[in-house]
C-alpha cells in the first residue's frame, strides 16, 4: 500500500512541479441510471498530470483516481457493490510526425485496494485537420496482474473531435473491448474558455455486457466535469 501511495505522490509531484511544459487537473461527477457496473448510482473521477516538452513532442505523466463512489450502492442483480477506487499511474511519450500527424506510446499501472490489478501498455495515433476535425485511436492491452490470471483483453478508443469555434469543442468516442465484446458511446461538449474549462458528457455504457442471469447491464450516465491547465 505504501508503494502505491508513493508512486501516486511522485506522479502528482511531477504534475505540479515547474518543469518546462504544462500541467493539468481534471475531475467529474457521473450520474448513472443503472449503476450496477460501477457499484453506485453516483461516481467520480479525478486526474492530474504534467507534460514535459522534448524534441520529439512531449512526455506526459499522470495519476488518476477512478470509481470514487458517492451515491447509493448497487449490490443486486449483478451490482458491483462497495468497491475501492482504482488508481492509475501512467506515462506517455508523443511523437509529432508532421504538423498534423502524431503517434504516442505509453504504459499505465492499475492498482486497487492496495493490490496490483492490471498492466496496461498502450499505443495511440491521431491526425488533426485544418478544418477543426481530429481523428484518433488508442489501443490498450489489459493484462491481468491478479491471481485470477484472466485472459488479456484489449480496449480500443476511436475518437472524432470537432472544434466548432474558439469556445466550443465537440467529440464522440467509441470504446470497444475486443475479448469481452462490449461497447461504450461517449458524447462530449467542452467550453474551451481560458482558465477552467467545464464539459458535459453523455455516456451509454456496457452494451453487450450481461449479469449471471443474462440481463443487460447497459448504463446511461450524465457526466459533469471541468479541466484546468496551467
Can you name each region flagged by the protein language model?
Residues 2-7, 16-230:
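Outer-membrane beta-barrel proteins
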Amino acid at each position: 500500500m505504501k508503494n502505491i501511495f508513493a508512486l501516486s505522490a511522485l506522479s502528482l509531484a511531477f504534475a505540479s512541479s515547474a518543469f518546462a511544459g504544462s500541467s493539468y487537473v481534471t475531475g467529474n461527477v457521473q450520474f448513472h441510471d443503472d449503476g450496477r457496473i460501477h457499484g453506485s448510482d453516483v461516481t467520480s473521477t479525478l486526474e492530474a498530470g504534467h507534460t514535459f516538452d522534448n524534441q520529439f513532442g512531449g512526455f506526459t505523466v499522470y495519476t488518476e483516481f477512478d470509481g470514487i463512489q458517492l451515491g447509493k450502492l448497487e449490490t443486486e442483480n449483478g451490482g458491483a457493490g462497495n468497491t475501492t477506487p482504482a488508481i492509475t499511474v501512467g506515462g506517455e511519450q508523443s511523437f509529432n510526425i508532421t504538423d498534423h500527424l502524431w503517434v504516442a506510446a505509453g504504459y499505465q499501472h492499475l492498482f486497487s485496494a492496495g493490490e496490483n490489478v492490471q498492466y496496461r501498455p498502450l499505443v495511440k495515433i491521431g491526425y488533426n485537420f485544418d478544418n477543426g476535425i481530429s481523428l484518433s485511436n488508442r489501443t490498450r492491452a489489459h493484462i491481468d496482474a491478479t491471481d485470477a490470471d484472466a485472459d488479456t483483453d484489449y480496449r480500443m478508443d476511436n475518437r472524432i473531435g470537432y472544434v466548432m469555434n474558439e469556445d466550443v469543442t465537440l467529440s464522440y468516442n467509441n470504446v470497444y473491448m475486443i475479448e469481452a465484446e462490449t461497447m461504450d458511446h461517449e458524447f462530449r461538449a467542452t467550453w474551451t474558455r481560458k482558465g477552467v474549462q467545464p464539459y458535459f458528457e453523455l455516456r451509454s455504457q456496457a452494451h453487450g455486457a450481461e449479469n449471471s442471469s443474462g440481463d443487460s447491464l447497459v448504463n446511461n450516465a450524465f457526466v459533469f466535469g471541468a479541466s484546468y491547465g496551467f
